[in-house]
Amino acid sequence: MTNIRKSHPLMKIVNNAFIDLPAPSNISSWWNFGSLLGICLILQILTGLFLAMHYTSDTTTAFSSVTHICRDVNYGWIIRYMHANGASMFFICLYMHVGRGMYYGSYTFLETWNIGVILLFTVMATAFMGYVLPWGQMSFWGATVITNLLSAIPYIGTSLVEWIWGGFSVDKATLTRFFAFHFIFPFIIAALAMVHLLFLHETGSNNPTGISSDMDKIPFHPYYTIKDILGVLLLILTLMLLVLFAPDLLGDPDNYTPANPLITPPHIKPEWYFLFAYAILRSIPNKLGGVLALVLSILILILMPLLHVSKQRSMMFRPLSQCLFWILAADLLTLTWIGGQPVEHPYIIIGQLASIMYFLIILVLMPATSMIENNFLKW
């Protein structure tokens, strides 16, 4: 008799994806982030579900309902902070996952990569809408500033913004629809993640060398299940350290003040994981130009396969490209720092230089370096 996990229609799918899946024998810990993102998503859906049981999406009661969750609901405080800091862990894993893909040339799996970029946009949209829900000062003003950017779109901009708001300003209608979308999006993300995995399993995983590993595969279970469990334990450890010892470390104190349309906070800024894009937006003095740069800063990932001119897939054996990659990583950290600073000298010029560097490295320097390295191969 055949093993049930190989014959049962449902078990067979799970078996081929997580148990008997042939995996390269040499994938490093940088390949752990896919499973960590899955864990993050499950954690966010579960904590979010329990928060939604007590949250009210009305401007008059939203702030108080979050306070009620933290004060009166059994373990409400831990659920709330696990959800808020879980988002931070989600983005850390996301950026590491994308960085891994860029470093090792995983973007040559076109379908997987493109679905991944769509996933990144969806997760960013979900996180933005979630940040609006507690209805604190930064929630309200963040929503106002970011949605207002759409008014830069010629001709239809203003109508589009008012359509999204459901009125002439961010108000009850906006909060209610953001809650509805914030609830449904994680399930769309889960579906997209399955498609992402489906496309990945069409080709099999990449590996650090970027060379085909077809002749040297090992079963996913037990080797990579054990390896993934280590990653999961480290993820949960980091998350719980944040939640239990410094729950507000990554948040904004302004969000503990209820939303007030009459008082603008001195420094409007998004959560830390959007600061790099916010810095790029602010570095361009023109509104439409800033919005375009903001969108392109993420959309540029779609161009990665087109910009790949190297004869080698991975950066493992390309020291010059490695150097550029880590300069890009440092540049993103610089942009993240600048995004949280006030708009004054010297931060303005640093932000502008870092923004130019970001696009220059990806669009010009990386392909140029790859061509130089191609010439090295002839020696």
Curated annotation (Swiss-Prot):
Heme b b566 binds at H97, H196. GO terms for cellular component: mitochondrial inner membrane; respiratory chain complex III. It is a multi-pass membrane protein. Its cofactor is heme b. The cytochrome bc1 complex contains 11 subunits: 3 respiratory subunits (MT-CYB, CYC1 and UQCRFS1), 2 core proteins (UQCRC1 and UQCRC2) and 6 low-molecular weight proteins (UQCRH/QCR6, UQCRB/QCR7, UQCRQ/QCR8, UQCR10/QCR9, UQCR11/QCR10 and a cleavage product of UQCRFS1). This cytochrome bc1 complex then forms a dimer. Keywords: Electron transport, Heme, Iron, Membrane, Metal-binding, Mitochondrion, Mitochondrion inner membrane, Respiratory chain, Transmembrane, Transmembrane helix, Transport, Ubiquinone. One of its GO terms (biological process) is mitochondrial electron transport, ubiquinol to cytochrome c. A ubiquinone binds at H201. The keyword Electron transport applies. Its main location: mitochondrion. It holds the Pfam family Cytochrome_B. Gene3D superfamilies: Cytochrome Bc1 Complex, Chain C. It is found in: Mitochondrion inner membrane. Coiled coil: none annotated. Binds 2 heme b groups non-covalently. The keyword Transmembrane helix applies. This is Cytochrome b.
